[in-house]
């Protein structure tokens, strides 16, 4: 929670504490906050070790599943669509349609023209009945 607080922010907090609490009560408040954080950390580590003892090897599996959920939670809608529905092909979103898709061998062989072949140099085919 406090992993990204820098020295500048700490200095601002001390200055605000000095103004609000005064120089007499500030050291006691800092000691109280440090001991409260230490107790909370000890309590949480005790709970973790108790769960590890009670659940056993399933605890690591549970942590793995929670890690996967955390990855999904951090995904943007675009990344989720790309990963799960489009099998990682993000050309729909990036507009990079020029790269050829890998060929899959047909059971009957090559019955028709290859869809990835380039159309000859000439006018672009146009269908007036198409919408």
UniProtKB/Swiss-Prot annotation:
Part of the twin-arginine translocation (Tat) system that transports large folded proteins containing a characteristic twin-arginine motif in their signal peptide across membranes. Together with TatC, TatB is part of a receptor directly interacting with Tat signal peptides. TatB may form an oligomeric binding site that transiently accommodates folded Tat precursor proteins before their translocation. Residues 96-106 have a biased composition (Basic and acidic residues). It comes from Mycobacterium bovis (strain ATCC BAA-935 / AF2122/97). The chain crosses the membrane at residues 2-22. Belongs to the TatB family. One of its GO terms (molecular function) is protein transmembrane transporter activity. Keywords: Cell membrane, Membrane, Protein transport, Translocation, Transmembrane, Transmembrane helix, Transport. Signal peptide: none annotated. The keyword Cell membrane applies. It holds the Pfam family TatA_B_E. It comes from the Bacteria. It is a single-pass membrane protein. GO terms for biological process: protein transport by the Tat complex. Residues 90-131 are annotated as: Disordered. Disulfide bonds: none annotated. InterPro entries: TatA/B/E, TatB. The gene is tatB. It is found in: Cell membrane. This is Sec-independent protein translocase protein TatB. GO terms for cellular component: TAT protein transport complex. The keyword Membrane applies. The Tat system comprises two distinct complexes: a TatABC complex, containing multiple copies of TatA, TatB and TatC subunits, and a separate TatA complex, containing only TatA subunits. Substrates initially bind to the TatABC complex, which probably triggers association of the separate TatA complex to form the active translocon. Its main location: membrane.
């Amino acid at each position: 929670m406090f992993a990204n607080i820098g020295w500048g922010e700490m200095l601002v907090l001390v200055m605000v504490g000095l103004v609000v609490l005064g120089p007499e009560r500030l050291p006691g408040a800092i000691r109280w906050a440090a001991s409260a954080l230490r107790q909370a950390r000890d309590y949480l580590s005790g709970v973790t070790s108790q769960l590890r003892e009670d659940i056993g090897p399933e605890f690591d599996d549970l942590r793995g599943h929670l890690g996967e959920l955390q990855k999904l939670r951090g995904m943007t809608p675009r990344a989720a669509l790309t990963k799960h529905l489009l099998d990682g092909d993000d050309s729909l979103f990036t507009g990079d349609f020029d790269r050829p898709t890998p060929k899959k061998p047909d059971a009957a062989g090559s019955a028709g023209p290859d869809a990835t072949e380039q159309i000859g140099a000439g006018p672009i085919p146009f269908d007036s009945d198409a919408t």
